[in-house]
Each structure stands twice: as C-alpha cells, then as structure tokens.
Swiss-Prot record:
This is Transcriptional regulatory protein YdfI. It is found in: Cytoplasm. The keyword ATP-binding does not apply. The keyword Transcription applies. The gene is ydfI. GO terms for molecular function: DNA binding. Phosphorylated by YdfH. It comes from Bacillus subtilis (strain 168). Keywords: Cytoplasm, DNA-binding, Phosphoprotein, Transcription, Transcription regulation, Two-component regulatory system.
Length: 213
C-alpha cells in the first residue's frame, strides 16, 4: 500500500482528500501538513511514497517545499491547486513535480495521476499539457528570434569572414566604425562567441555562412 502525505493549508481540503483517498485500497494517508515547512519535515520523518502538494501556503510555498524535498528525496510529488497560471505550471514541472492538477479535477483523474507518478511517469491533464506545449513553442520561437542575426549583421559577418577589419567594413557599408563594432558585439552575443574567428566558425556550423559566402 502506497503511503500518502497531504499538504494543504485548508483543513477542509485535507479532510476531503483523506476521505477520498481512503476509498482506494492502493493508498493510505500517513500524514498531513498545513504548509511547506511542515511538509519538508514530514517528508524526512515519514518517508511517504507520494505527496499531494498545494502551492500557496503560509511560511513556505509549495514550490519551495518541492525544491527542498527533491534535494534529498526522489518522492513523486503531485501539485494540487486552484491556480492554473503559466509560471506555476512551468516551475512546478521543472522542479520535478510528476503532475499538475486543479482542485476541480475528478477523483478518477487524481488516482490515474497518482498511479502514474508512483510508476515514475508524469501524467498531465490534456488542457494543461496543451498549454505547456504552447509555452514551450513560444519559448523556442523567442529563443530563435533572440539568436537570429539581422541582415545587416550577416553582411558584417561575411565581411569578417573575408578578413576585413572594422574600418574597411565601415567604409564599404557607408557607416561609422562604431556602428560596425556595435553590430559585431551583437553578433558575439547572439552566437555566444568571444572573437571574430569564433563567430565565423560558429556561423558556419549553424549554416549562417557557407564557404561560398
């Protein structure tokens, strides 16, 4: 039988979860905590097989509790909250939570998520999974935009690859040498380079420049 630790600052929620979980003979309640600080202590003392964790609580939040518990234990933790804010979902999953459930979820979904967590899997509700995928896509898109060189920066990079110095590049482009150096700094930052040679090498590896350029 799997030992469950319930963490929530509302007594009525803890009592309701206890009554629900006791209907499943695969689980037994071994403890309950009213905040993250108590949860961290009980995780050490009781060594539960799974933890149901609220997020917003006094003294210590659920996210901080997850972080501290995960530093010492591999106990699967399922977030059970009323909040579906993007940053909470992301941070919770990144900290190692095996699930993110809203408190209006069905008992069937709760038990399925707990069963999956016990097996070491992450099971997310379709709407939450979809939102996390959208967030990941937005992150990747933003990252691509942040690292993508502008047309003017590519022109400078091509000139550098030909061995031209900043002064010569500035003359050819009809801009100031200061502008060229500014674009070069931007190129370094976007490519993670520390020198002209490294910038050209990375650009060729990424396909931004080719030998024909």
């Amino acid at each position: 039988m799997n030992k469950v630790l319930i963490v929530d600052d509302h007594l009525v929620v803890r009592e309701g979860l206890k009554l629900l979980i006791e209907t499943n003979d695969q689980y037994t309640i071994i403890g309950e905590a009213e905040n993250g600080k108590v949860a961290v202590r009980l995780a050490d003392e009781l060594e539960p097989d799974i933890i149901l964790m609220d997020l917003y609580m006094p003294e210590m939040s659920g996210l901080e509790a997850i972080k501290q518990i995960k530093e010492k234990h591999d106990t699967p933790i399922i977030i059970l909250t009323t909040y579906n804010e993007d940053h909470l979902m992301i941070e919770g999953i990144e900290l190692g939570a095996k699930g993110y459930l809203l408190k209006d979820t069905s008992s069937e979904t709760l038990f399925h998520t707990m069963d999956a967590a016990i097996r070491g899997n992450v099971l997310l509700q379709p709407d939450i999974l979809k939102r996390l995928q959208e967030i990941q896509f937005e992150r990747m898109k933003k990252q691509r935009n942040e690292t993508q060189l502008t047309e003017k920066e590519v022109i400078v990079l091509k000139a550098i690859a030909k061995g031209l110095k900043s002064k010569a590049i500035a003359f050819d482009l009809g801009v100031s040498e200061r502008t060229v150096k500014s674009r070069l700094t931007s190129i370094y930052n976007k490519l993670g380079a520390n020198s002209r040679t490294e910038a050209v090498t990375i650009a060729m590896q990424k396909g931004i420049l080719t030998i024909d350029n």
